[in-house]
């Protein structure tokens, strides 16, 4: 579910509604901006132009989202090395595996990149070409109450999700993001995107 549904009365529990409300709020955005400081550009009167996706008035500069996600228990990487949408400002991932989930893998992996990434296939999930894929420099385990967040300030912010092994249960997580809406005509970095 995405924030546009989770914020509607009666769709989810009050606890989940409040969780979503906070993580799509100007208060949360400002907390993240404080952490990442100069990596996130100041927007004048940001409190008047930020709203959860699906709740804006059509000309808000920044959209926020809080999404509950379930990936099927298939034994292959659910996400190869890629970069995110250049309009995305930040992304956070909260892992919520079932207590009885004894699978391995499903880790969030941060990659070193080789050279400057200049071009990606938008339809292909912005997967990074083999020539730009470097070694994994950090892995964040898929375990309960683990949260990882990054500022999407570079076309070299390459990350992936490792292959899950012996998975019988869905991989559960919450995505928390903010991104520039198209009306803002802004992005965090420049990159050529093609559709193939």
Q: Where is each model-derived feature located?
A:
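A structural signal for well-ordered alpha-helical segments within the folded catalytic domains
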Residues: 26-30, 34, 90, 142-143, ...
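Eukaryotic charged/polar low-complexity linker/IDR segments
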Residues: 93-95
């Amino acid at each position: 579910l995405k924030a546009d549904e989770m914020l509607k009365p009666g769709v989810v529990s009050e606890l989940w509604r409040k969780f979503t409300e906070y993580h799509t709020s100007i208060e949360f955005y400002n907390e993240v901006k404080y952490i990442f400081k100069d990596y996130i550009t100041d927007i004048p009167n940001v409190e008047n132009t930020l709203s959860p996706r699906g709740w804006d008035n059509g000309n808000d500069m920044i959209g926020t989202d809080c999404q509950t996600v379930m990936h099927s228990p298939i034994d292959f990487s659910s996400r190869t090395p890629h970069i995110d949408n250049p309009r995305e400002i930040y992304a956070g991932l909260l892992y919520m595996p079932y207590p009885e989930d004894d699978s391995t893998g499903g880790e969030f992996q941060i990659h070193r990149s080789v050279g400057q990434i200049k071009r990606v296939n938008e339809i292909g999930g912005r997967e990074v070409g083999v020539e730009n894929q470097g070694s994994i420099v950090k892995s964040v385990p898929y375990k309960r109450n683990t949260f990882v967040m990054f500022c999407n300030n570079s076309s070299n912010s390459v990350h992936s999700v490792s292959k899950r092994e012996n998975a019988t249960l869905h991989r559960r997580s919450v995505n928390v993001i903010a991104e520039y809406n198209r009306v803002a005509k802004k992005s965090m970095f420049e990159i050529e995107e093609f559709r193939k």
